[in-house]
Amino acid sequence: MANDYFFTSESVSEGHPDKVADQISDAILDAILAQDPTARVAAETLCNTGLVVLAGEITTHANVDYIQVARNTLREIGYDNTDYGIDYKGCAVLVAYDKQSPDIAQGVDKAHDDGLDQGAGDQGLMFGYACDETSELMPMPIHLSHRLVERQSQLRRDGRLNWLRPDAKSQVTLRYVDGKPDSIDTVVLSTQHDEEISLEKLREAVIEEIIKPVLPKHLIKGAINFLVNPTGRFVIGGPQGDCGLTGRKIIVDTYGGAAPHGGGAFSGKDPSKVDRSAAYAGRYVAKNVVAAGLASKCLIQISYAIGVAKPTSVMVSTFGTGKISDEKIAQLVSENFDLRPKGIVKMLNLLRPIYRKTAAYGHFGREEPEFTWEQTDKAAALRAAAGL
């Protein structure tokens, strides 16, 4: 029974203050890339009660109204009323961007080890992961957590539950048997709400309208512990309830804790930053390995040195699920995927304004047309090369 256990992941809605910051950072990145695809962008955002601060390093010839981009993002999320914690119309927006350091630029613009390529924008380690728990090849707990807060947003936006406000969090605990999802044990959903709604009415509506439609029937075995707004009240939320910062939801953004994380956040960073682009490439590799049937679970670690194009290491682990050895899979990866920064950008077509959409509800496991790292177009070649 050593392989029977409980595992939990969480997600947050687009109105969570840290996600507000992520979305503003990525909206600014998109606005710049739309005019200047080779810009260098590291856009950080802080949001608090009535205040947005934009800081970081940007080198570009694009002409972007950063303040208006921030306000538009708040409006699109739903922060159009001071009662919600911040109002796009009246909040203060402070801008404090510098240019990228020339000491960094000289190693990124031209690699020290490869005259035809750009170097990595920083040192670091990144992970990619995929498993066969869902059709999207994602771990089930983070998949369900994302779907719950997505549904909260959907019912808020279409007016079916018009007392919902933008800020919300979800958490799902699954029981695993023999290493596979067996049943849902606990679902937590906390949502910001209007003052007038009673807790009893709120809990009933959240369970029946938000939670139950999301849960897969095959994972419902016996009573589920539903915890809805367990504090009893969640009127004050968003940037008023907590200060939001870019890059503070890196586990929500990735695999919900089911795989390691190298520590680098994604939002606000252009694709020369391997924190983002190599993590996307890692997901692309791992997903294609699993889609090819080479393993039911795949983890890849990639590492880089600043100014150097070629990865300093590539590691593959299939946790004993591989049809061929991990070493052979690693060899196939090196033969089929260009993991140099410029190779990744070309392979995944990353110099496009596609990032705002990634900044809420997960960067992975969403088969959006722009999310090239979710494609499984290399699976057939991997399978053939493996002789399966």
Curated annotation (Swiss-Prot):
K(+) binds at E44. ATP binds at H16, D167, A168, K169, R233, F234, D242, R248, K249, A265, K269. GO terms for cellular component: cytoplasm. SUPFAM superfamilies: S-adenosylmethionine synthetase. Residues 100-110 are annotated as: Flexible loop. GO terms for molecular function: ATP binding; magnesium ion binding; methionine adenosyltransferase activity. Pfam families: S-AdoMet_synt_C (PF02773), S-AdoMet_synt_M (PF02772), S-AdoMet_synt_N (PF00438). Its EC number is 2.5.1.6. PROSITE patterns: ADOMET_SYNTHASE_1, ADOMET_SYNTHASE_2. Pathway: Amino-acid biosynthesis; S-adenosyl-L-methionine biosynthesis; S-adenosyl-L-methionine from L-methionine: step 1/1. InterPro entries: ADOMET_SYNTHASE_CS, S-AdoMet_synt_C, S-AdoMet_synt_central, S-AdoMet_synt_N, S-AdoMet_synthetase, S-AdoMet_synthetase_sfam. Disulfide bonds: none annotated. Mg(2+) binds at D18. GO terms for biological process: one-carbon metabolic process; S-adenosylmethionine biosynthetic process. It comes from the Bacteria. Binds 2 divalent ions per subunit. Binds 1 potassium ion per subunit. Its cofactor is Mg(2+); K(+). It is an enzyme of class 2 (transferase). The keyword Cell membrane does not apply. It is found in: Cytoplasm. The keyword ATP-binding applies. Keywords: ATP-binding, Cytoplasm, Magnesium, Metal-binding, Nucleotide-binding, One-carbon metabolism, Potassium, Transferase. Catalyzes the formation of S-adenosylmethionine (AdoMet) from methionine and ATP. The overall synthetic reaction is composed of two sequential steps, AdoMet formation and the subsequent tripolyphosphate hydrolysis which occurs prior to release of AdoMet from the enzyme. Belongs to the AdoMet synthase family. Homotetramer; dimer of dimers. This is S-adenosylmethionine synthase. It comes from Polynucleobacter asymbioticus (strain DSM 18221 / CIP 109841 / QLW-P1DMWA-1) (Polynucleobacter necessarius subsp. asymbioticus). The gene is metK.
